Amino acid sequence: MYVIKKDGTHEEFNVQKIITAVNKSAARILYTFTDEELQFLCDFAKDKAESLKKEGITIQEMHNIVEGALEAVNPAVAKSYRDYRNYKLDFIHMMDDVYTKSQSIRYIGDKSNANTDSALVATKRSLIFNELNKELYRKFFMTRDELQACKDGYIYIHDQSARLDTMNCCLFNVGEVLRGGFEMGNVWYNEPKTLDTAFDVMGDIILSTAAQQYGGFTVPEVDKILAPYAMKSYRKYKEEFAKYADPSWTNVEAQAEKYARDKVKRDCDQGWQGIEYKLNTVGSSRGDYPFVTVTLGLGRSEFEKLISISLLEVHREGQGKAGNKKPVLFPKIVFLYDENLHGPGGACEDVFEKGIQCSAKTMYPDWLSLTGEGYIASMYKKYGKVISPMGCRAFLSPWYERGGMKPADENDEPVFVGRFNIGAVSLHLPMILAK
């Protein structure tokens, strides 16, 4: 006995193919057959096929036999099997929906996300692909119960257009990437030797890597990352001044230090200005302006404080035409507040004052207390580790160096930088409680 395929070719009757097909259908509704149920399905299908007394059975007849066997064992799996069998017809309807949405995006635009400018061709392509990806996710990945729960409003699965491909938000370890150089695309980047180059390279890294995820991209404690490159520039400018200074000048050393500090301050201001322009004008390959956050404020050294103060001043001034400057959206700034550092007489009180001035005018930075109450503060107090937000509101739970989810011992420490989270699902708790 053989099965006649859709293309007219013949294939020997094989119960193993039935087992494979029914297991796939069962998996779609999170059901697992027992060995006895699988044996029943195989015996049922074989007996039914033989009862037809035909040498060749069409694939349509075989589908009907398997469907009948599944109805006898588990009607829900039978429905899953039937749905999958008819997926080509469903696919046509799905593509029709995607086409309708694509026409709307092309000729009307899309205003659902302020970070995506649907007037741009690259963004139109991305939005259309997202519509297709969302339909594929709903059709071939979500279970029937999940679809129904979403439809009824009990849950909401975020970012359905992207969550199958990559991760959501991350705390990117820019400092580790810069250190020693790295490869991006087909080009090797050497470690920056000056602050202005470090700003340029950091901007390239952000645009490239933020496009490989769909959530918020955070550069944690950026003041500490850039400070070593500020020191390199400082030394370079001092040597430059000494090279051209007249030995007869008085206080040459003091003049060299002032010259170097002024140049580093200018590099800082221009570097942050360049970052702001880059992140708000150059769309990523994902078709949007990436949601980039930087955290700062804990650096105590001269150049760490300079980098923080410079960003706060640049953001406070805004970008645009003279007389019509406006603060930009990205990078979002989060000030890491430590009462002992930033309170009256603290080592970083001056940074705090600049943050207050910036916040009063632009509503940035956001403020994250590390010495108050709650989870974030408790981790900082116990381990001295900062949990920067990923994007605007996602905070990682601890992962310990040796113990994983739980500390191996009292000396085990949590790791946050260099980690990410997966897609979010919102629960409608009042509806769930009422149910």
Give the positions of each predicted feature.
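Charged, amphipathic alpha-helical regulatory modules used
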Residues: M1-R106
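Conserved catalytic cores of very large enzyme subunits
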Residues: F91, D97-K435
